[in-house]
Amino acid sequence: MMSRFGIGALALAALAVPLAAFAAGEEPAAAPMLTEEQVTKGRQMFQDNGCNACHTLADANAAGTVGPSFDGNANLDKGHAVQVITSGQGPMPSFGWLGDEDIDLIATYVVQVKK
Protein backbone atom coordinates (compact mmCIF):
# COMPACT_ATOMS: atom_id res chain seq x y z
CA MET A 1 0.00 0.00 0.00
CA MET A 2 1.30 3.42 -0.93
CA SER A 3 1.84 5.99 1.82
CA ARG A 4 0.25 9.43 1.73
CA PHE A 5 3.66 10.82 0.84
CA GLY A 6 3.94 8.39 -2.08
CA ILE A 7 0.48 9.28 -3.37
CA GLY A 8 1.25 13.00 -3.06
CA ALA A 9 4.56 12.59 -4.88
CA LEU A 10 2.86 10.60 -7.64
CA ALA A 11 0.18 13.29 -8.05
CA LEU A 12 2.83 16.01 -8.12
CA ALA A 13 4.81 14.13 -10.76
CA ALA A 14 1.66 13.72 -12.89
CA LEU A 15 1.16 17.50 -12.85
CA ALA A 16 4.80 18.40 -13.45
CA VAL A 17 4.91 17.78 -17.22
CA PRO A 18 1.78 19.76 -18.18
CA LEU A 19 2.72 22.57 -15.81
CA ALA A 20 6.26 22.71 -17.19
CA ALA A 21 4.89 22.95 -20.73
CA PHE A 22 2.56 25.75 -19.65
CA ALA A 23 5.33 27.61 -17.82
CA ALA A 24 7.61 27.28 -20.83
CA GLY A 25 4.97 29.03 -22.93
CA GLU A 26 4.48 26.12 -25.29
CA GLU A 27 1.61 26.45 -27.71
CA PRO A 28 -1.40 24.15 -27.41
CA ALA A 29 -1.51 21.26 -29.85
CA ALA A 30 -2.58 22.36 -33.31
CA ALA A 31 -6.03 21.42 -34.53
CA PRO A 32 -5.98 18.62 -37.11
CA MET A 33 -6.14 19.71 -40.74
CA LEU A 34 -9.55 19.42 -42.35
CA THR A 35 -10.20 17.96 -45.77
CA GLU A 36 -11.64 20.28 -48.42
CA GLU A 37 -15.05 18.64 -47.88
CA GLN A 38 -14.84 19.33 -44.13
CA VAL A 39 -13.78 22.95 -44.77
CA THR A 40 -16.82 23.38 -47.02
CA LYS A 41 -19.10 21.89 -44.35
CA GLY A 42 -17.48 24.01 -41.61
CA ARG A 43 -17.95 27.16 -43.70
CA GLN A 44 -21.59 26.28 -44.33
CA MET A 45 -22.21 25.62 -40.63
CA PHE A 46 -20.48 28.91 -39.73
CA GLN A 47 -22.86 30.74 -42.07
CA ASP A 48 -26.02 28.73 -41.30
CA ASN A 49 -25.67 29.30 -37.55
CA GLY A 50 -25.24 33.05 -37.91
CA CYS A 51 -21.58 33.25 -36.86
CA ASN A 52 -21.01 35.55 -39.84
CA ALA A 53 -23.42 38.12 -38.41
CA CYS A 54 -21.04 38.91 -35.54
CA HIS A 55 -17.57 37.70 -36.54
CA THR A 56 -15.14 38.55 -39.35
CA LEU A 57 -13.72 35.59 -41.27
CA ALA A 58 -12.61 36.15 -44.86
CA ASP A 59 -12.98 32.49 -45.86
CA ALA A 60 -16.70 32.65 -45.01
CA ASN A 61 -17.19 36.14 -46.50
CA ALA A 62 -18.10 37.23 -42.98
CA ALA A 63 -17.67 40.86 -41.96
CA GLY A 64 -19.49 41.04 -38.63
CA THR A 65 -18.28 43.62 -36.14
CA VAL A 66 -20.11 42.68 -32.93
CA GLY A 67 -17.83 39.82 -31.92
CA PRO A 68 -14.08 39.45 -32.31
CA SER A 69 -12.54 39.09 -35.75
CA PHE A 70 -11.06 35.66 -36.36
CA ASP A 71 -8.81 36.79 -39.21
CA GLY A 72 -5.31 37.39 -37.92
CA ASN A 73 -6.28 36.44 -34.36
CA ALA A 74 -3.12 34.76 -33.08
CA ASN A 75 -4.76 34.06 -29.69
CA LEU A 76 -7.54 31.93 -31.12
CA ASP A 77 -7.04 28.24 -30.45
CA LYS A 78 -9.36 25.29 -30.94
CA GLY A 79 -9.85 24.52 -27.25
CA HIS A 80 -11.00 28.04 -26.46
CA ALA A 81 -13.21 28.13 -29.56
CA VAL A 82 -14.92 24.87 -28.52
CA GLN A 83 -15.47 26.23 -25.02
CA VAL A 84 -17.01 29.51 -26.20
CA ILE A 85 -19.19 27.88 -28.88
CA THR A 86 -20.43 25.32 -26.36
CA SER A 87 -21.08 27.61 -23.40
CA GLY A 88 -21.27 31.12 -24.83
CA GLN A 89 -19.35 34.11 -23.49
CA GLY A 90 -20.42 37.71 -22.92
CA PRO A 91 -23.07 38.60 -25.52
CA MET A 92 -22.46 35.39 -27.49
CA PRO A 93 -25.10 32.75 -26.74
CA SER A 94 -24.37 29.08 -26.19
CA PHE A 95 -24.51 26.83 -29.23
CA GLY A 96 -24.12 23.67 -27.13
CA TRP A 97 -27.25 22.27 -28.75
CA LEU A 98 -25.25 21.75 -31.96
CA GLY A 99 -23.54 18.72 -30.45
CA ASP A 100 -19.88 17.91 -29.92
CA GLU A 101 -19.11 16.78 -33.48
CA ASP A 102 -20.50 19.92 -35.14
CA ILE A 103 -18.93 22.24 -32.54
CA ASP A 104 -15.57 20.53 -33.06
CA LEU A 105 -15.89 20.97 -36.84
CA ILE A 106 -16.75 24.68 -36.61
CA ALA A 107 -13.92 25.35 -34.14
CA THR A 108 -11.39 23.45 -36.24
CA TYR A 109 -12.60 25.23 -39.39
CA VAL A 110 -12.24 28.70 -37.86
CA VAL A 111 -8.76 27.98 -36.50
CA GLN A 112 -7.62 26.44 -39.80
CA VAL A 113 -8.83 29.15 -42.18
CA LYS A 114 -8.17 32.33 -40.19
CA LYS A 115 -5.73 34.51 -42.12
What are these language model-derived features?
Residues L10-A13, A21:
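Cleavable N-terminal signal peptides
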Residues N49, G88, V110-V113:
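Alpha-helix boundary/capping residues
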